Amino acid sequence: NNREVNKKMNRVCEVLGIEKPIIQGAMSWITNAEFVAAVSNAGGLGILGPNAGQKDITSDPDETAERMRREIQKTRELTDKPFAVTLIGSGNSTSVFTMKILDVVIEEKVPVVLINSYGFPGMLGIYKALLKPLKDNNIKMVVRSILPSVEDAKVVEEQGADVYVATGFDEGGTLPPRMIGSFNILPMIKDAINIPICLAGGIA
């Protein structure tokens, strides 16, 4: 079976249970259940980004979380493949919105979570707050730092993450504050950690 061979040959595929080492961008407002299921059904990892499936914003953390729950359930109706939900960490504390969605992710037994972070040292408290409960519930964790560094990658690995995503300045959306290209940031980090590493930014 070629699909099983591909999984065994690629550590990202093996860890996340996907067929192709492709992780869909967790774009705010753009993703929905149909989008995510299509990516997962094609062998990649589809991700429900912030405000997935929504056309308007709510200031109520509980309603935000319940909207994500409904989108998770819709996704499950469209695919039996692994998919992920995004959790956002910023500043030096977790927001009530993030923690409410964390609860939903655990309750719904989502197979994978993508944590969008802003890099160590300010993220250490957030890593501890998010990664431990996810690990305790056997949810795979992909951490994408917008300020990737060897130090951050090591901390992420120590806190139990399964995959680290390094983002270069080539990317679209929220740009890293340092102007280091994607293919320059990768060799800085890949030999410093043992968990699989993915690269984001300017790759097509």
What residues fall within each predicted segment?
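Active-site entrance/lid segments in N-terminal catalytic domains of soluble metabolic enzymes
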Residues: 5-198
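A short glycine-centered flexible hinge/capping loop motif at secondary-structure junctions
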Residues: 200-204
